[in-house]
């Protein structure tokens, strides 16, 4: 039932490992692109919601954030949160090793960070209207995220990436417009529910840092958020999705390494 999709994920893990090993610059550029694409989505949703009544903000923000994952998947780039799922399937299927997985994940995260900060810098240099005003939703949301309790961030991170990886998983199981519908629904649920995505937070934090933020907003708070959200994102991508669908597949139907072709799939 899930064998074909797992095969695609494991083959993509092998592609990611080859790209990282054979073309490190290309891998870092592609990772930065993913961070930038998610950042563009963050700028969009905060621009749209800044002047809205708080009661409708979650719906508007959720309904428009689908652009972020659409850009990542359709344009092609390397997103940390998607890699947590892809690389887990790769390890279980034997297309990559544990060592490769744990070497690639931090590189992807750092590459995403570069792209996220770069987009925030461009927005700031372009006179970003959200940044100079200390009452902007960017500053209030960023501060709230950096002061939230660790376990709240961890579990919100887990719920978030469960939805993100489900969106990616479903794009591999559908064709045509159904891919976009899957992305839209999952990201609507993630944003409207107030969950935490480490890469999306990177651009938000950079935007607030470059603007007229509160003195209570600190680098230590940013690090606190990104640590716990990243761990939560990793849990759901690797365990809930990767191991979950692996063990949901009958043992006789699970793929083995020699079945993989080297066809590239959407990076996610």
Residue locations for each model-derived region?
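Alpha-helical transmembrane segments and their helix-helix packing motifs
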Residues: 1-268
